Every structure is written in structure tokens, then in C-alpha cells.
A protein has these predicted regions:
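Catalytic binding pocket for nucleotide-activated donors in carbohydrate/polymer assembly enzymes
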Residues: 2-11, 92-95, 121-203
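Conserved catalytic-core segment of nucleotide-activated headgroup transferases in glycan assembly
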Residues: 3-90
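Donor nucleotide-activated moiety binding/catalytic core segment of transferases
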Residues: 12-14, 72-127, 131-132, 142-143
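Short, surface-exposed amphipathic charged segments that create phosphate/polyanion-binding patches used
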Residues: 20-30, 112-120, 178-182
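Hydrophobic beta-strand segments of well-ordered beta-sheets in folded domains
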Residues: 26-31, 71-76, 98, 116, ...
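Hydrophobic transmembrane helix bundles of membrane-integrated enzymes that assemble
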Residues: 30-33, 67, 118, 138-139, ...
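Soluble or luminal CAZymes and related metallo-dependent hydrolases
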Residues: 51-59, 170, 205-209
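C-terminal alpha-helical cap of glycosyltransferases
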Residues: 200-224
Length: 224
């Protein structure tokens, strides 16, 4: 990012690898959710305080927009820190048929049983799913999760191939459209090309990580 001269890409530091799962053969649909403190204490691009209730409503709208058959296959992973929002209670009051994970289980156990991974907030969650080659759909309200100008072209490309959505309805429709042939979508050339471009910019693992870090540190030290 030319507007961030002090930030230098070196690669993805948290190394994750594919689980060796043929996701097309799995039956689960995994929705990974987030929560935030009830009171604002810092300013960043994301839901603040009671905006989380709008975020939760988007999650409910996503589920309601899915066909009944997919709702029955869905597991919702709640954020491990509840912040007194009573996530589990709210979900159970809205949906009696949805499986909930309280965020305590190793997420890889859920991923291994899932055909598709749905990320709902802008953090490392989808970067890791990309590098693990898990079929992934992302959606969030762009008024809550704003991205910097330099990143917009990359997300526009994700949107073009059906990975990124700005409404829960659009995401749910796409999930239902590709569900029966995930590989036909996820392994298609347009999707692979966009993913490779995005990963090379934001979550590159095919690089000399330690060498890149050393080179950047030496370059900085030589300035003094």
C-alpha cells in the first residue's frame, strides 16, 4: 500500500496448511461469527458497541435466506468471548433447528466436516481459510467493516467470482447456487486466478518468510 510506507509485506506469519480433506464430499455448512465488547473503547474498522446487534441480524438474515435443506446442515460457530451478549440464547430463540458451536472446540474439527466455510467479518479468519484451500464465502456490511482504498480492487475481484458479498441475501443465494458442485466453482480458473492474486498480496505462504523478515529488519536498521 503506497499510503502505508512503514508497512512491508513479508508473508503470512501464522502458518496453516490444508487438512487433506475433500470438502466436496463433506456435508456441513460452517458459519463463523464474531462478537465485540458492549461498550466502545477503541476506534477501528468493525462493529462498535450496539452495532453488533445489526451484525447479528445480518447473520439471522443469511440463515433465513438459505433453503431449508441447507439450514439443516448448518453449524454456527459463536465467538468464544460472549461479552454478555447471550449469543447462544439469541440464536436459540430465533432458530430451534440450528446446530451451535460455542467457540471452544478446535475449529479444524468443524472445518474437516464442512463443504463450505462462511466468514462474516474482516479478520484473519478468511485469510487462513484461503491458505488452507477451504471453499469460502465472505459477507459483511461494508459500512461496518470498511476497507482501505488500496484493498478495494482486490475485494472487487473476490466479489466478481462470488467469494465476497456485501449482503447476507447475496451470500446465501450464492451458497445455494454452488452447493451441489462446490469444486466446479472453487476450482474454476477465474476463482483460482483471483485467489492467487489476493493471497500473493495479503496471505502469501509460498515465500521465504524468515528471509523476508530478516531482509526487512536489516533494511530498517541500515537507515540509522
Amino acid at each position: 500500500d503506497p499510503d502505508q510506507p512503514k508497512v512491508h509485506p513479508v508473508g503470512q506469519i501464522k502458518m496453516v496448511k490444508p487438512l487433506g480433506v475433500d470438502h466436496q464430499k463433506e456435508t456441513g455448512l460452517l458459519l463463523v461469527t464474531n462478537a465485540n465488547p458492549r461498550y466502545s473503547f477503541q476506534i477501528f474498522s468493525g462493529t462498535q458497541s450496539s452495532q453488533w446487534l445489526d451484525y447479528l441480524d445480518d447473520q439471522f438474515q443469511f440463515v433465513e435466506s438459505l433453503p431449508k435443506g441447507l439450514q439443516d446442515l448448518l453449524t454456527v460457530r459463536l465467538y468464544f468471548h460472549d461479552y454478555a451478549w447471550e449469543q447462544e440464547k439469541r440464536w436459540n430463540e430465533r432458530f430451534s433447528n440450528i446446530a451451535l458451536d460455542l467457540g471452544k472446540k478446535n475449529i479444524n474439527e468443524l472445518i474437516a466436516k464442512s463443504r463450505l466455510y462462511v466468514a462474516t467479518y474482516n479478520a484473519g479468519t478468511y485469510l487462513q481459510s484461503f491458505t488452507m484451500n477451504i471453499p469460502t464465502v465472505i459477507f459483511w456490511n461494508s459500512k461496518h467493516w470498511e476497507i482501505r482504498d488500496a484493498a478495494i480492487p482486490y475485494f472487487d475481484e473476490l466479489k466478481r467470482v462470488g467469494i465476497f458479498h456485501e449482503t447476507p441475501e447475496s451470500a446465501a443465494f450464492h451458497v445455494s447456487e454452488v452447493w451441489d458442485d462446490i469444486d466446479g466453482w472453487w476450482k474454476s480458473k477465474p476463482v483460482r486466478d483471483v485467489l492467487e492474486q489476493f493471497k500473493s498480496q495479503y496471505c502469501d505462504i509460498d515465500c521465504d518468510l524468515t528471509g523476508n523478515i530478516e531482509a526487512e529488519l536489516r533494511a530498517e536498521s541500515n537507515k540509522f
